[in-house]
Amino acid sequence: MKILVPIDGSENSLRALRHVVSHHGGSGEAIELHLLNVQAPIASGAVKMFITQTQLNDYYRDEGLAALKEARAIMDGSGLPFHYHIGVGEIAPTIASYAKEKGCQQIAMGTHGRGGLAHAFLGSVATRVIHLTDLPVSLIK
C-alpha cells in the first residue's frame, strides 16, 4: 500500500506521520510511504529581477529539505520504505495530483499545518485535499 503523508514541518504533520508509522510498522503489510513537502511559489515578478531561477529552485529545495528533516529522521528509524519529494505550487492541488501520479491508495495528513488564521477551523488545506481527491484521506488530530 502506498500512503502519501504531506509534511510541512509542523507538529501536526509529524504527528500524522508517527501515526502512520506506528499503525503500519511491523504489521507485515507491504507499505511504501511518500513524504511530500509543497513550497508555495514566489509569485512576484519583481523578485525574479534580482534572483535567477536556479537560485529560486535552490531556495525551494533548501526550505523543503528543512521542513522534511525531522520526518526523514522518523522514517530512517522506522525501517519502512519511503520516498520524499519537494513540490512547488498551490498546496492542496499539488498534494492531490502527486498522490494520483504516484499511485497512492491513501493520504494521511494533519488537520492543521503551519498556516495562520485560515487554518483556525479544520485546516483549509486538509479541506481542499478532501474535495480534490477520490482517495481516502485520514486526518490526524
What does each model-found stretch correspond to?
Residues V21, L65, K69-D76:
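Class I S-adenosyl-L-methionine
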